[in-house]
Swiss-Prot record:
GO terms for cellular component: extracellular region; membrane; other organism cell membrane. Its main location: secreted. It is found in: Secreted; Target cell membrane. It comes from Eumenes rubrofemoratus. This is Eumenitin-R. One of its GO terms (molecular function) is toxin activity. GO terms for biological process: defense response to bacterium; defense response to fungus; innate immune response; killing of cells of another organism. Belongs to the MCD family. Eumenitin subfamily.
Length: 15
C-alpha cells in the first residue's frame, strides 16, 4: 500500500 499516494489521492478528493 502506497500511503503517500493514498494521502495525496484523498487530499485531491477533499479539495
Amino acid at each position: 500500500l502506497n500511503l503517500k499516494g493514498l494521502i495525496k489521492k484523498v487530499a485531491s478528493l477533499l479539495n
